[in-house]
């Protein structure tokens, strides 16, 4: 392979004028043996221009990601798909670790992705040598090889981070080699605060973080001291930067936005990340699983106090206005939160708690300069930042809130102290408005514990009236927004004065409709919706204004693209379904325009937020459609708008649009629940085309819509053979293409629905096709009883459709592995699996099928062999049906939840300085604890499986109804008894064969079924 030719092609990809020709050259060359190793040689060569090396690294990364894993041809393909040749793989494996060590940072980033993919597919099977290779450089006295080898080791560790314990053996073996060296290396470097030293330390900590659950008590002590030292040591004021041509830099003069990225703060962040993770997951007695009980006790008593002492120092530094990076502060607060529940750590924390809450937590919860700057420069970005879940997760302010809430709930002195502190601020007319914002933020954060204590709950209405309502008209926009947020937080409060509630609703509505500041409008929208949800009278007050309110909500959504507001508008639509009727079409049109705008925006593909927002818009349209479903005139107008939205998604390539398929299929389902227009029948063909392009993953999402096509307008379905052909072809493709057993169950169910829906409607020509499709699937091995019984059920439905046709079909089906007709195999499988028919519909179908089987005029020979199983199987099915009918009578929907603003006290406080769960701690147990010997009563457990919740409550597929499930559908009790009586009168010998195996209990049960059938016949009532 000529390296110069590849170099020229790579150089061409950087030049827009040469890119197309260069890419064609590379695409014609990449399958040639030695191409990939040549790329790696180019990447590491310092004689090659840097941009070319970068381009080569990106190309190699893409090749490894796509073509490293062995791939077999898919069904129907003749040519084997391209894989990187094994000789080339060997060369890359041999040189990849060295390449990572030698290359600069931007190229390393591409190569580490390559290495992780290689390890994923080749370790340990094809590449056990990677461990020795990394260890060679890690043990080297040449410090220049340490960082690169640690990056390589990190890829190995990350591959195992989330694997089950039993799959981690190769990693455990490797870490026996690496852990001592990692500990030795970081200990050696701790006193060296230079950039490269701390960079290596940080990488060691990242590796350790991914291994935390594997560390035992023996080695933990050394690591705890290392972690404590890293957190405790000072960040150097001046550092020597090799990357900036040897210049000295002052850390304290770095821009504040850049300081968190300094390596010393990153190193502290990872040390704290480890400590917090250990405490939360493994070191907190009473909150750990059984295997960590001993370690949790050991951790709390041995390490927690020493670590917490260091963290108290970190918080004091922040309080004294010394710089602490946001993530370090956030992790510090998270660790302290965990310590609140334990007496040992609480006793150490308690003397400092008032200072922490008043002088550290409180300032974090106040409106800041950076908030004001962002609000003024970009209010929409301010909204996005305030509602971003990830930002919340890593925010010091959120961690401060969590610490405050936990302490207020768990330790009795915290809540009164904090409320008194906030009260003093609120009553002070000269208080800094930002401190007023902080006080309201604290009170809103503590709303839940405040509403649970009568002493505070009774004062909250007055507090809102005196301190919150006036600020809803403040000239400071951030105080108006905060006041709306407080009303949102206290929306469950039981108001004693109706005028106060009315005033709250009116003020919030005014801020929503009239305020000029978008962040205020967003908070007002959320507050109004929660008031309407929690206060019946608020719902009444807003009813006359619902049109301007909804229009304003749409305007805000259009302007801000804030996903939280799509949830608000959906809930308002459900609350005011009648009032929304007159504006439903306009709302849907507006939402469709917003959706189109989002999809066509330039930054759509780069912004995950826009995808989330677009999904929220589709969900809102779906809500309108659901609420308006039975209003025919409106639904017809909505259909055209919805079809435009559906078309917008389906016309684009599946890449980038697939995330919307579930939502647009839900829209199409909503448009077909009551009637199906010609336009919706045309959509079936479009969906079929989409399905053909690897959309098996979405078949289960298509299922409700396909069910509607079959059941809502069966006449139209049967009027044109292509409709039924399309649906059958989709089901057949799912059943023959390894789509997975869940989609296959759905495909079989749809075939059953078609058979039952079209019984007596002349689809005889379809029955052999349907039956052969499911039986062929059965012969290929089935893992789950659900798929097995579902395939059998299609054949049983065909038996119900036309017994003679079904038996004829079975006698004529031959599969390659067996020259015999499949009749005997099918009936034997059915007899063996009757106990796996669960739920009401499936058992009912099985009973009807067995009843028909008993009456067959021309009995297949296999029936003589299984005759003794037929009636006992039916009796077992009726036992299940009896339990289902009884449970449906007993388990009427209950009214859950207590009245809002409950008068009951709920005390979560821990007495005095005790632990939340006792000093020894209690392991978290599974929801059902074993009793006695594990092997005891095994037989009973097997029997009880037949009566588990799934068996009684039905199966998920039962939501796809058939004529059998209607109130006037076939009665299985009457059907079975009538069949057995006809057999008794027409063929006494066969009747004797059917009933003679029954024991006394079974005969009694049979008589009960006769009696119940008679009762149901005379009363016309089903169920018990």
Curated annotation (Swiss-Prot):
InterPro entries: ARM-like, ARM-type_fold, Importin-beta_N. It is found in: Cytoplasm; Nucleus. Residues 896-969 are annotated as: Disordered. GO terms for cellular component: cytoplasm; nucleus. Its main location: cytoplasm. Residues 22-102 form the Importin N-terminal domain. Disruption phenotype: Knockout animals present mild to severe dorso-ventral patterning defects during early embryonic development and display severe cardiovascular and skeletal defects. Residues 902-917, 934-952 have a biased composition (Acidic residues). The keyword Cytoplasm applies. Pfam families: IBN_N. GO terms for biological process: intracellular protein transport. Keywords: Cytoplasm, Nucleus, Protein transport, Transport. It comes from the Eukaryota. Belongs to the importin beta family. Involved in nuclear protein import, either by acting as autonomous nuclear transport receptor or as an adapter-like protein in association with the importin-beta subunit KPNB1. Acting autonomously, may serve as receptor for nuclear localization signals (NLS) and promote translocation of import substrates through the nuclear pore complex (NPC) by an energy requiring, Ran-dependent mechanism. At the nucleoplasmic side of the NPC, Ran binds to importin, the importin/substrate complex dissociates and importin is re-exported from the nucleus to the cytoplasm where GTP hydrolysis releases Ran. This is Importin-8. The gene is ipo8.
């Amino acid at each position: 392979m000529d390296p110069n030719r590849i170099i020229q092609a790579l150089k061409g990809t950087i030049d827009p004028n040469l890119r197309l020709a260069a890419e064609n050259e590379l695409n014609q060359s990449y399958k040639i043996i030695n191409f990939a190793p040549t790329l790696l040689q180019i990447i590491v060569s310092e004689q090659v221009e840097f941009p070319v090396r970068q381009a080569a690294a990106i190309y190699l990364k893409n090749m490894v990601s796509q073509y490293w894993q062995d791939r077999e041809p898919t069904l129907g393909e003749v040519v084997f798909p391209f894989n990187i040749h094994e000789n080339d793989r060997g060369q890359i494996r041999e040189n990849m670790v060295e390449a990572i060590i030698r290359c600069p940072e931007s190229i390393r980033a591409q190569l580490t992705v390559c290495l992780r993919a290689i390890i994923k597919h080749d370790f340990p099977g094809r590449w056990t040598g990677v461990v020795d290779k990394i260890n060679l450089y890690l043990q080297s006295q040449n410090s220049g090889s340490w960082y690169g080898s640690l990056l390589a080791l990190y890829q190995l560790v990350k591959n195992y981070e989330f694997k089950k314990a039993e799959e981690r053996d190769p990693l455990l073996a490797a870490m026996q080699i690496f852990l001592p060296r990692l500990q030795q290396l970081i200990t050696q470097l701790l006193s060296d605060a230079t950039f490269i030293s701390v960079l290596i330390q940080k990488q060691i900590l990242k590796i350790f973080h991914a291994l935390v659950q594997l560390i035992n008590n023996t080695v933990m002590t050394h690591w705890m001291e290392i972690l404590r030292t890293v957190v405790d040591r000072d960040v150097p004021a001046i550092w020597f930067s090799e990357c900036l041509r040897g210049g000295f830099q002052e850390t304290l003069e770095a821009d504040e936005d850049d300081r968190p990225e300094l390596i010393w703060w990153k190193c502290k962040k990872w040390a704290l990340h480890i400590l917090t993770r250990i405490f939360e997951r493994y070191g907190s007695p009473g909150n750990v699983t059984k295997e960590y009980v001993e370690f949790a006790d050991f951790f709390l008593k041995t390490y927690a106090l020493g670590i917490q002492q260091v963290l108290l120092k970190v918080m004091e530094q922040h309080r004294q206005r010394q710089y602490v990076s946001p993530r370090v502060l956030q992790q510090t607060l998270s660790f302290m939160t965990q310590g609140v529940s334990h007496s040992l750590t609480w006793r150490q924390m308690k003397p400092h708690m008032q200072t922490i809450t008043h002088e550290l937590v409180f300032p974090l919860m106040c409106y800041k300069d950076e908030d004001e700057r962002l609000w003024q420069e970009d209010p929409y970005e301010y909204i996005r930042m305030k509602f971003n879940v990830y930002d919340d997760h890593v925010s010091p302010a959120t961690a401060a809130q969590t610490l405050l809430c936990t302490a207020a709930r768990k330790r009795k002195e915290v809540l009164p102290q904090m409320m008194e502190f906030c009260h003093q601020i609120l009553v002070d007319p000269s208080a800094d408005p930002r401190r007023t914002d902080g006080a309201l933020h604290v009170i809103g954060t503590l709303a839940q514990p405040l509403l649970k204590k009568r002493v505070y709950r009774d004062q909250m209405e007055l507090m809102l009236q005196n301190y919150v309502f006036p600020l809803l008209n403040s000239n400071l926009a951030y105080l108006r927004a905060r006041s709306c947020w407080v009303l949102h937080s206290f929306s469950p409060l039981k108001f004693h004065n109706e005028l106060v509630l009315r005033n709250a609703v009116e003020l919030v509505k005014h801020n929503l409709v009239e305020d000029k500041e978008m962040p205020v409008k967003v908070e007002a929208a959320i507050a109004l919706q929660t008031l309407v949800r929690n206060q019946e009278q608020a719902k009444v007050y807003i009813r006359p204004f619902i049109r301007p309110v909804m229009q304003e909500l749409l305007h805000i959504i259009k302007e801000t693209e804030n996903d939280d507001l799509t949830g608000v508008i959906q809930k308002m639509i459900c609350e005011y379904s009648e009032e929304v009727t007159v504006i439903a079409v306009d709302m849907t049109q507006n939402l469709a325009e917003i959706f189109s705008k989002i999809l066509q925006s330039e930054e759509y593909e780069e912004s995950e937020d826009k995808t989330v927002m677009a999904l929220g818009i589709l969900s809102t349209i779906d809500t309108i459609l659901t609420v308006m479903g039975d209003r025919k005139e409106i639904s017809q107008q909505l259909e055209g708008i919805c079809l435009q939205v559906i078309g917008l998604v389906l016309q684009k390539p599946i890449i980038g649009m697939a995330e919307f398929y579930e939502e647009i299929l839900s829209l199409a389902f909503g448009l077909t629940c009551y009637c199906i227009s010609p336009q919706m029948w045309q959509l079936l063909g479009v969906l079929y085309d989409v399905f053909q392009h690897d959309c098996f993953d979405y078949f289960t999402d298509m299922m409700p819509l396909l069910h509607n096509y079959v059941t809502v307008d069966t006449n139209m379905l049967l009027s044109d053979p292509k409709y039924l052909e399309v649906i059958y072809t989709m089901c057949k493709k799912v059943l023959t293409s390894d789509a997975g057993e869940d989609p296959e169950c759905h495909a079989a169910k749809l075939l059953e629905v078609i058979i039952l829906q079209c019984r007596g409607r002349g689809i005889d020509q379809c029955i052999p096709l349907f039956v052969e499709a499911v039986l062929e699937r059965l012969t290929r091995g089935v893992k789950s009883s659900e798929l097995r019984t579902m395939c059998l059920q299609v054949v049983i439905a065909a038996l119900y459709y036309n017994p003679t046709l079904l038996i004829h079909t079975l006698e004529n089906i031959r599969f390659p592995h067996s020259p015999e007709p499949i009749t005997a195999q099918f009936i034997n499988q059915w007899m063996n699996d009757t106990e796996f028919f669960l739920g009401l519909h499936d058992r009912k179908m099985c009973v009807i099928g067995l009843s028909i089987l008993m009456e067959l005029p021309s009995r297949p020979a296999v029936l003589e062999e299984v005759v003794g199983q037929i009636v006992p199987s039916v009796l077992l099915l009726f036992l299940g049906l009896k339990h289902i009918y009884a449970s449906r009578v007993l388990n009427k929907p209950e009214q859950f939840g207590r009245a809002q603003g409950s008068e009951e006290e709920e005390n979560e406080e821990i007495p005095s300085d005790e632990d939340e769960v006792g000093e020894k701690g209690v392991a978290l147990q599974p929801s059902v604890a074993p009793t006695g010997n594990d092997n005891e009563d095994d037989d009973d457990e097997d029997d009880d499986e037949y009566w588990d919740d799934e068996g009684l409550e039905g199966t998920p597929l039962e939501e796809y109804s058939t004529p059998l499930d209607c109130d006037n559908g076939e009665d299985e009790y009457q059907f079975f008894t009538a069949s057995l009586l006809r057999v008794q009168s027409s063929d006494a010998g066969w009747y004797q064969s059917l009933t003679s195996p029954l024991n006394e209990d079974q005969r009694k049960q049979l008589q009960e079924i006769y009696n119940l059938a008679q009762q149901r016949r005379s009363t016309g009532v089903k169920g018990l």
